[in-house]
Amino acid sequence: DLWQFNKMIKKEVGKLPFPFYGAYGCYCGWGGRGEKPKDGTDRCCFVHDCCYKKLTGCPKWDDRYSYSWKDITIVCGEDLPCEEICECDRAAAVCFYENLGTYNKKYMKHLKPCKKADYPC
């Protein structure tokens, strides 16, 4: 669920998810869309959106899943039918960490509208 995803991001990158990733670029935040992702961080959100689109029959934002930390690694459980949601969230949190160097404050609360055409997954 969204709360668990936020906790993963906070622990992985050490930043509060909402102010830093809640409205970043074209794809971070609710209803991402537009042209090519702005940078590596925005691409993490784009890939996360694509991952969610591939899931069927699972409520993406409110389905709780099991996960844990093994040393510094997120480990998703395997006990629920919608555990793939955890894998999408885990991959995005790791991607944010790997792309901390691409984070650009000019894309935070990005007010310039992104093109309406969907960039293909």
From Swiss-Prot:
BP GO terms, sorted? arachidonate secretion; lipid catabolic process; negative regulation of T cell proliferation; phospholipid metabolic process
Co-factor(s): Ca(2+)
Q: Which residues form the signal peptide?
A: none
Q: What class of enzyme is it?
A: hydrolase
A Pfam family this protein belongs to?
A: Phospholip_A2_1
Q: Which residues bind Ca(2+)?
A: 27, 29, 31, 49
In terms of PROSITE patterns, this protein maps to: PA2_ASP (PS00119), PA2_HIS (PS00118)
InterPro entries in the cross-refs: PLipase_A2, PLipase_A2_Asp_AS, PLipase_A2_dom, PLipase_A2_dom_sf, PLipase_A2_His_AS
Write the protein's name.
Basic phospholipase A2 BmTX-I
What is the species of this protein?
A: Bothrops moojeni (Lance-headed viper)
